[in-house]
Amino acid sequence: MDLSKTRVIPSNALESGGSAPAGRRYGGVDKDERQRQRRDKLIQAGLAVFGEKGFHAATVRNVCHHAELTSRYFYESFESMEALFEGVYVHVSSELMRRTVTALQASPMVPDLLAETALRAFLEYIREDPHRARVALIDALTVGAGASRISNESNKDFARLIATFIEMLYPTLAADTGLDPIYVANGLVGSNIRIATVWVEEKCATPLEVVLRNMFAFYQASISYADARLKEAQASKAQPTA
């Protein structure tokens, strides 16, 4: 399977449709590219400010000061702080998906190894910059309906990724055991989110390997249960009929 085609929320999902004429060029950079660069600076500034202060304490002035841009350029790309937050969330989620898929592509197709690889990528991404986790795991639930919708779609994307691997590794699981890969996958995503949230709330004080071991336990239990149920199903099929 080509995992490069795994859907993520597009980075331009929150931009308005249609592109303006290129306009004048300065230093070899046209108008659209300059606007894109300013938008990227605001996204990075938003991540830093939201991650440090929290969404509800952050202001347009804080973000513009960090980005070294005037408020005119803020409103060029975002109609509100909520819109900026949604843009930051999309950036964080899309980058995590890309990193996860890249790591999985390099992993052997063995259930335990795949799970550990994906979880390590997730935890390392958080530890590199805990601001990402505050945006994605904590504030996203309180910003508004738009952020909640985007967060929910992102969680579904990661659940679909896990479900895809379950179906590849256990193609007869649903038929033989009644276990639904998408329900199992959503449960695993939920455990990831809760454990990661606790880790972030303690400022990542617990060593990553300890957090990984505890997060991985849910995957090991699911793998063991799936293996046991499949063996039971195979044994039942092998029994002679009367």
Where do the PLM segments sit?
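Hydrophobic alpha-helical segments that form the core
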Residues: 2-19, 176-201, 209-222
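Generic hydrophobic, amphipathic alpha-helix propensity
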Residues: 34-46, 63, 88-96
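Helix-turn-helix
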Residues: 41, 49-83
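Alpha-helical DNA-contacting segments of helix-turn-helix folds
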Residues: 58, 62, 78, 83-95, ...
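Hydrophobic alpha-helical connector segments
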Residues: 87, 102-131
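Amphipathic alpha-helical packing segments from all-alpha helical-bundle domains
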Residues: 94, 146-171, 182-193, 210-213, ...
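Amphipathic alpha-helical segments used for helix-helix packing
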Residues: 128-146, 163-166, 197
